[in-house]
Amino acid sequence: MQTRNAFSCIKEGITRSISISIMIYIIIRAPISNAYPIFAQQGYENPREATGRIVCANCHLANKPVDIEVPQAVLPDTVFEAVVRIPYDMQVKQVLANGKKGALNVGAVLILPEGFELAPPDRISPEIKEKIGNLSFQNYRPTKKNILVVGPVPGQKYKEITFPILSPDPTTKRDVHFLKYPIYVGGNRGRGQIYLDGSKSNNNVYNATAAGMVKKIIRKEKGGYEITIVDALDGREVIDIIPPGPELLVSEGESIKLDQPLTSNPNVGGFGQGDAEIVLQDPLRVQGLLFFFASIILAQIFLVLKKKQFEKVQLSEMNF
């Protein structure tokens, strides 16, 4: 009996330990996987500044292209595709946080007009679902359903990102009208150069903080360098810390200037933004236009028939 109780206690303890470990893993893992959206969402209420600049450019300093494709016009309460393309050289590798080289990831933010939002799963067609793949979209804010973010995701698989969008219906949403609306997009490939607190990442150039001579370079055990510079003005020693990743450009005994690059620029990615326009079309206007075209065609047909009838009458009178 005592043996059975002891076994039950051990079993219960193991089960509890496993459960706690799983919970800790989930809590720690979640922020890492959602790092790209969280950086922007935590720091900025709106991803697009008053100047039109998307805030992702504050961390991703290099300028790269991005393209968006949307229909010219859509009807109310209709699901359509907004395709964002983030091109880059598939052969290049980026510097990871640990200093090693790895594949690039991509991310995007899509700023839709008020009323437009992510389409619900039951409204998305199988064809669009196939294009979406395993992508997971989220709202920039719970109250801003018209601003969507995605990433980071593997760039080799998702250089082209398809957003399923549901257009609003002005008959049910009084603040939406049948007009032409702008759509804004921002897309990045690779890691940023600046963190949200303003500090540099290891995906950046590191410059000398003093002018003088490089006295000593110590290679750290976990990667990176510690560079000692003797200041040319007062002879004091200045230590610059280089994280793992960037390649060193200077050597011991070399004279350097203030702000001279100590490392190469490891960044191979960058950020770009673009825009497009879409018309929320009134179905009655479309029907009226079709009716107008149909009436013109019928008028042309009747005119031709009348002309032929008139020619027959003239011909019969001449023969008479």
From Swiss-Prot:
Native source species: Glycine max (Soybean)
Gene Ontology biological process: photosynthesis
Annotated InterPro entries: Cyt-f_TM, Cyt_f, Cyt_f_lg_dom, Cyt_f_lg_dom_sf, Rudment_hybrid_motif
Localization per record: Plastid, Chloroplast thylakoid membrane
Phylogenetic placement of the source organism: Eukaryota, Viridiplantae, Streptophyta, Embryophyta, Tracheophyta
Record-listed heme binding positions: 36, 56, 59-60
Subunit and partners: The 4 large subunits of the cytochrome b6-f complex are cytochrome b6, subunit IV (17 kDa polypeptide, petD), cytochrome f and the Rieske protein, while the 4 small subunits are PetG, PetL, PetM and PetN. The complex functions as a dimer.
Protein name: Cytochrome f
Keyword ATP-binding in record: no
